[in-house]
C-alpha cells in the first residue's frame, strides 16, 4: 500500500515499538532473564547481518516468527526448544529477515486492516490506540510471509551457519531444499553460541 512506502523510518520504528508493546499485552508478557536477554543479543550479533536486530520471545508455539515495522522480530518459545542446536533458532531469525526483506510487514498488515487505517497513517504518520490494537491483532493472527529460499540461503551463507539443522525442523520441500543447497554441508564453521550461552537462551521463559 502507498502508506507503507511513504512512512519515514523513524515512524516505522515507533510503530513497531507500539505494536510490540501491544502484542506483549495481548499475548505476553515477553520472556525475559538477564542471561537470556544478553544471549539473544549475542545471537543477533553473530548473524553478521549489519543491522540492528531487536529480538523478543513469547511463550507458545508458532511455525514462523512475527516481523514488525522497523525490524523487530518476535520469536516463540518452541523456536528455542525445538532442538539442541542453536543453528535452528538462528534459522528462525534468518527466515524472519528474509521474509521481511521480501515483503514489508507493514504493507501486509495494512492490507488486512483496510483503507481507513492506511489513510490515517498517510495523513498523520500516527495511529490511534484502537488502530494499533487492530494491527497487533492482525500480526498475531495472520500467517506470516514465508521466506524465499534463495534469499534465506544467502543469509545462512553470510552468517556462516549451516542451514541443515533448521531444515530438519521444517516439513516438506522447503526443508529438503535447504538441506540440498546448504552452504556448509559439513556443519557451521564457527560455533553459533557457546553451550552456556545457548542454555541461558533456551531457559529465557523458564523463570516466569
Q: Where on the chain are the PLM-derived regions?
A:
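Peri-catalytic and regulatory segments of divalent metal-dependent proteins
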Residues: 2-107, 193-197, 204-207
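Post-HEXXH active-site segment of zinc metalloproteases
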Residues: 104-129
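Generic secondary-structure transition motif, activating predominantly at the C-termini of alpha-helices
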Residues: 7, 19-27, 44-48, 122, ...
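C-terminal capping/extension segments of zinc metalloprotease domains
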Residues: 1, 55-63, 67, 81-82, ...
Amino acid at each position: 500500500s502507498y502508506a507503507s512506502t511513504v512512512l519515514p523510518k523513524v515512524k516505522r520504528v515507533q510503530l513497531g515499538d507500539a505494536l510490540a508493546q501491544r502484542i506483549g499485552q495481548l499475548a505476553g508478557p515477553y520472556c525475559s532473564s538477564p542471561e537470556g536477554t544478553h544471549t539473544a543479543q549475542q545471537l543477533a550479533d553473530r548473524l553478521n547481518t549489519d543491522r540492528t536486530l531487536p529480538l523478543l520471545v513469547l511463550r507458545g508455539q508458532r511455525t514462523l516468527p512475527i516481523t514488525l515495522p522497523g525490524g523487530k522480530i518476535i520469536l516463540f518459545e518452541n523456536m528455542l526448544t525445538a532442538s539442541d542446536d542453536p543453528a535452528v533458532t538462528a534459522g528462525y531469525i534468518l527466515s524472519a529477515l528474509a521474509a521481511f526483506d521480501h515483503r514489508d510487514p507493514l504493507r501486509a498488515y495494512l492490507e488486512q486492516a483496510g483503507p481507513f487505517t492506511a489513510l490515517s497513517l498517510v495523513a498523520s504518520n500516527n495511529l490511534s490506540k484502537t488502530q494499533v490494537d487492530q494491527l497487533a491483532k492482525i500480526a498475531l493472527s495472520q500467517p506470516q510471509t514465508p521466506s524465499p529460499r534463495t534469499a534465506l540461503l544467502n543469509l545462512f551463507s553470510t552468517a556462516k551457519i549451516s542451514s541443515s539443522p533448521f531444515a530438519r525442523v521444517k516439513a516438506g520441500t522447503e526443508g529438503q531444499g535447504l538441506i540440498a543447497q546448504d552452504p556448509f554441508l559439513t556443519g557451521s564453521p564457527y560455533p553459533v553460541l557457546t553451550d552456556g550461552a545457548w542454555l541461558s537462551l533456551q531457559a529465557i521463559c523458564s523463570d516466569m
